[in-house]
């Protein structure tokens, strides 16, 4: 099967105007446990790497390889860890939006592309549906976010082995839900999420 690549990189229009583009994406909006990770990347104008694409379509090995390459090649990047407490306080959408806004304000750039997330910022921007498939910068952000979050969940798996975090990454798989029903929730579960809220009285 032919590898998918960001052939029609959304950045080109802005690179042709000599504008530096920041791409932002996140990993971990749907899980019941663990943090949300948001990452932004700014590349040199005209940057090319056909291997960089939506993190969900890449193998774990490939994502790990690209994780280091992206950080080496990027003009700048930022990775933010949004805790379970922040998610419960603001809700997942607002927590994601806040983190993306902070990255957009932190990194020097002329234009911002997010993966389907509008931001109230003083920079030109576009909220691009399936941005990680259309923009190399957003795709790079998705890879940094995904690898970072997967590593965190593997660490938590060592602390809470019965939940299968190394494999399910906190998503509501059968094993994970059954473990919640049997052992209760942990300190890293998102208490505002339905299946977790129901079992709050039982803490691992």
Where are these regions (language model features)?
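RNase H-like, Mg2+-dependent phosphodiesterase core
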Residues: 1-204
């Amino acid at each position: 099967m032919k590898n998918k690549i960001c052939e029609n990189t959304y950045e080109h229009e802005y690179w042709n105007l000599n504008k530096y583009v920041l791409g932002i994406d996140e990993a971990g909006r749907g899980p019941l446990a663990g943090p949300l990770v948001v990452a932004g990347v700014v590349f040199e104008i005209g940057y090319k790497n056909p291997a960089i694409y939506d993190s969900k379509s890449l193998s774990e090995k490939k994502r790990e390889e690209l994780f280091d390459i992206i950080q080496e090649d990027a003009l700048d990047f930022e990775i933010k860890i949004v805790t379970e407490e922040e998610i419960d306080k603001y809700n997942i959408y607002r927590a994601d939006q806040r983190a993306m806004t902070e990255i957009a304000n932190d990194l020097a750039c002329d234009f911002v592309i997010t993966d389907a997330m509008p931001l109230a910022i003083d920079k030109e921007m576009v909220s691009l549906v399936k941005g990680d498939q259309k923009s190399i910068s957003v795709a790079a952000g998705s890879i940094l976010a995904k690898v970072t979050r997967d590593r965190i969940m593997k660490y938590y798996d060592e602390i809470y082995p019965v939940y299968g975090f190394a494999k399910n990454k906190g998503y509501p798989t059968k094993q994970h839900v059954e473990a919640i029903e049997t052992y209760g929730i942990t300190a890293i579960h998102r208490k505002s999420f339905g299946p977790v809220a129901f079992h709050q009285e039982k803490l691992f």
